[in-house]
Curated annotation (Swiss-Prot):
Protein name, UniProt field: U11-theraphotoxin-Hhn1o
Residues covered by region (Disordered): 61-83
Localization: Secreted
Family annotation (InterPro entries): Toxin_22
Pfam families: Toxin_22 (PF08092)
Disulfide-linked positions: C75-C90, C82-C95
Prodomain residues: 22-74
Length: 113
């Protein structure tokens, strides 16, 4: 009976000591994986930030082009009313008093140069 107890005690001590070693090993392994995960997350975060900055630059570029085009479209064309005191004329147009049509409105219109 004593040999059974000694054998059981020996197996128990070995299991506990090896289990502790595995636990420490697992803890160290998890720390390494966590550190690797952090570096991967930092890399992914930087990559995402670069993509967002590129997208923002494209959107701002499109907005500036759109506003530039819309300004040109507002006064493009002949016969559009304008202000005689406002020097902002579109290229190729000049703000003049109408000769025949529109004289009853008492305003100036864009005409081609």
């Amino acid at each position: 009976m004593n040999t059974v107890r000694v054998t059981f005690l020996l197996v128990f001590v070995l299991a506990v000591s090896l289990g502790q070693a595995d636990k420490d090993e697992n803890r160290m392994e998890m720390q390494e994986k966590t550190e690797q995960g952090k570096s991967y997350l930092d890399f992914a975060e930087n990559l995402l930030l670069q993509k967002l900055e590129e997208l923002e630059a494209k959107l701002l570029e499109e907005d500036s082009e759109e506003s530039r085009n819309s300004r040109q479209k507002r006064c493009i064309g002949e016969g559009v009313p304008c202000d005689e005191n406002d020097p902002r004329c579109c290229s190729g147009l000049v703000c003049l008093k109408p000769t025949l049509h529109g004289i009853w409105y008492k305003s100036y219109y864009y005409y081609k140069k």
